Amino acid sequence: NFNYGEILEKKPIGFPQDGGKLKPYSNLFYWAHAWTPGTKSTIGLHPHQGFEICSFVLKGNINHFDTKQNKWIPLKEGDVQIIRSGNGISHAEEIDDNSEIFQIWFDPDLSKSLKKEATYDDYSSKDFKLIDKGNRSFKVIVGEGSPMHMDSEDVCINEHYLSEGNHSFDIGKDLIHSYFIIDGEIILDKKKLERGTFFTVSSENEVVFKSSETTKIFEIISPLTPSYRTYSQLR
């Protein structure tokens, strides 16, 4: 936790020293699910370099400050920001009371990114197109038709909204699909997976499951083996 418990978090992928369910894989380096159970809380100015750092507002509001913008920028539920931290940037973030975010770090090939100037972009929820598939729909956050640009190789990010019933996701060849259940629950391989569950799927043609209620699932698709050596491979 941060700030004496004002910010609580679980880390599907954590830093080596603080423990995560998994070590870095693909070009995913770090993934934190963070929330404020009560009062708002601020994480003060701190530096980053090399990585692409994305924040996804799942609930409530956050405020972002960095040394490129030099001002506080508000973001609300459904909004996304990306810091391409390049050769260095410092930022601070304030998470409002009863708010919830993902912060996810991607490795864009540090041998190249560390030579670039840092850049920042934020995107409103309405910038992302919603595709209706009948008993489910999904929002394309990174991928075809999305305005959000990432340097990290072959990354797609979707948010799925599923009605009760049977569903399947296609699994791409040479890709790993990382899933986090934001709301609801599913039955997968006869096991109940509840809100807050993180899992990955690869080397399959599809994943078939049943949603026992209205469910929201966050998906990141990334290469099983990036074409470059990642930071975690070099350490």
What is each model feature region?
Residues F2-L45, G50-I53, I101, F128-S168:
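A short glycine-rich, His/Asp/Glu-containing loop-to-beta-strand
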Residues I43-G44, N61-N63, V80-I82, G86-E93, ...:
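Histidine-centered metal-chelating micro-motifs
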Residues P47-N63, W105-D109, H160-S163, G172-I187:
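Short, conserved beta-strand element in jelly-roll/cupin
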Residues I53-P108:
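Contiguous mid-protein beta-loop-alpha structural module that forms a pocket-lining wall or clamp
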Residues D66-R84, G172, I187-S211:
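Short acidic-glycine-tyrosine-enriched beta hairpin
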Residues I82, A92-M150:
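Surface-exposed beta-loop interaction hotspot
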Residues S85-K112, S202-Y231:
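Ligand-binding loop in jelly-roll beta-barrel domains
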Residues S146-T200:
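Hydrophobic secondary-structure block in the mid-to-C-terminal portion of proteins
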